[in-house]
From Swiss-Prot:
Endpoints of the signal sequence: 1-19
Protein name per its UniProtKB record: Protein VEL1
Subcellular location: Cytoplasm, Cytosol
Domain of life: Eukaryota
Transmembrane segments: none
Record family assignment: Belongs to the VEL1 family.
Induction (record text): In zinc-depleted conditions and has increased expression in NAP1 deletion mutants.
GO cellular component terms listed in the entry, alphabetical order: cytosol
Length: 206
């Protein structure tokens, strides 16, 4: 993959950081279907209380329409009404909710993430997106096995990074979460991150 940096907001040490394989055997949550199977949240290693999740915000088109039209869109559960930005943040961050990943009851391997929305990757920036219209974009690619890619990065030959690639992410003070090839040099607006499995109650999530 190649990544073109148009705007550079944050400069970090450029490195070819390789994520490690994550082992769920060191995590034991109470009340699960087996010693290590169940649901987990993903905490960023080295950043206590920072988790992988989604921030929601009201789009500009909603702010310019009538209250009646906006209410109808909300009741219709239109995904575009409240766009979701895949990001990392603390539990106390407003409009933020963690992504919950579920393990396979037989193998305990990461199986699925979050709700029923299908993740897509922007093939230009590598940004993970959950927008319902992402699959129709020319530069979108369906991500299979996203949970395993995030937790077993070495096996899948990818790096996971938090990035401030565009104006919106800086204004919202919220980084995007991007996937890069294992041999790619990260853009100077990205920082490599690693994730670990954490039991939701222990992390402060119900």
């Amino acid at each position: 993959m190649s990544f073109l940096s148009i705007f550079t907001f944050f400069s970090v040490l450029i490195s070819v950081a390789r994520a490690v394989r994550f082992d769920l055997t060191n995590v034991t949550c109470k009340g699960l279907h087996g010693p290590h199977c169940g649901t987990y949240v993903m905490e960023v290693v080295g950043q206590n209380g920072t988790f992988l999740g989604q921030s929601t915000f009201v789009g500009a088109d909603v702010l310019t329409e009538s209250a009646g039209d906006a209410w109808a869109r909300y009741l219709g559960q239109e995904t575009r009404f409240l766009p979701k930005l895949t990001t990392i943040a603390s539990n106390e961050t407003k409009n933020f909710s963690p992504l919950i990943f579920t393990t396979n009851i037989n193998t305990c391997n990461p199986q699925s993430i979050g709700d029923a929305m299908v993740p897509f990757a922007n093939t230009v920036t590598g940004e993970i997106e959950y927008n319902s219209w992402a699959d129709t974009a020319d530069n979108a690619s369906f991500i299979t096995g996203l949970a395993n890619q995030l937790f077993n990065s070495t096996d899948y030959g990818v790096q996971v990074a938090s990035c401030y690639p565009n104006f919106a992410s800086v204004i919202l003070s919220t980084p995007t979460v991007n996937i890069f090839g294992k041999d790619d040099t990260l853009p100077d607006y990205c920082t490599a991150i690693q994730l670990k499995a954490v039991c939701p109650p222990e992390a402060g999530f119900d």
